[in-house]
Each structure stands twice: as structure tokens, then as C-alpha cells.
Amino acid sequence: MVDGCLMLFNLKFFKKKIFDENFFLYFEETDLFKRCLNKKIQILKLNTVNFSHKGRSSSDNKYKRKIEINRNWHYMWSKFYYNTKHYGYLYALKESLKNLISSFLKGYCFIFLNFNKREIYKARFQGCLNAILLKKSLFRPDINF
């Protein structure tokens, strides 16, 4: 697996933008690598290179819940968008229905038990539903720095 937090490019292979700007947070590198493979552009992974990436360390802890909700919303939206882009709407719909139903049911189950989990599953459901309805990925956390 190649992670998108550290990548180097030979820009001669890219006439337009490298990343699809419809993605936010998730599946950007998966989409890029899929497009590279489709164009027979070689991808190299160097197993001898090590680096430290402190994920989620740039934000204040007081925003942790809002950021987690944002992450879950965008994961579901981006997953559907990726599948639609590369395999078609019906395939994406088939792959996402179980996530949509599961998120709805889990959100309902946690309605009285755990507010934080309920909000997470609500975000997953809404992200998936927005993607199915072909709405843009416009959800952002309400954070004032």
C-alpha cells in the first residue's frame, strides 16, 4: 500500500492538475494511483525510506469531535465518489448501500446510549446519502480559529 502523506512526482506525466479536487481528505491518492496505472505510469514504493507523520496533530484537541465527524462524513462521500468515477454509479450504489443502512441503524441504536457515536454514524450516513444524491462535498466542520 502506498500512503498519500509523502509522494514525489515526475510532473512530465501530468498535463493538468495532479489531484481531483472533488476529493477532500480521502481517496485522493487512491484515485491518482488508479489513473497512473490506467495510463501505464510506473509507481515506485521505496520500502527503505522512513519518515514520521503525526496524523491529526495540527489541530487543537478541543475540536477533536468535530474533526472526527468531518472525517467520517468525507470518508463515506469520497468512497462513493471514487467508486462512481472508476466503476460507475450503479456499482458505487451497490457497494455503498450496506454502509448507508449500517450507519442509519447504528446511529439509531446509539440515540440514547452514546451521543458521540450517534453523531459519527449520522455523519457517515449523511456523507453517503449526499454522494448518492450526487451532491458536492461541501461539508466542513464549524471551527473558528
Each model region followed by its residue ranges:
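Active-site-adjacent helix/loop segment of glycosyltransferases
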Residues: 38, 42-119
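Alpha-helical packing segments of well-folded alpha/beta enzyme cores
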Residues: 29, 75-79, 124
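Residue-level signal for well-ordered alpha-helical scaffold segments within enzymatic catalytic domains
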Residues: 16-17, 35, 81, 85, ...
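Membrane-interface aromatic/basic loop that binds lipid-linked glycans or pyrophosphate carriers
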Residues: 115-145
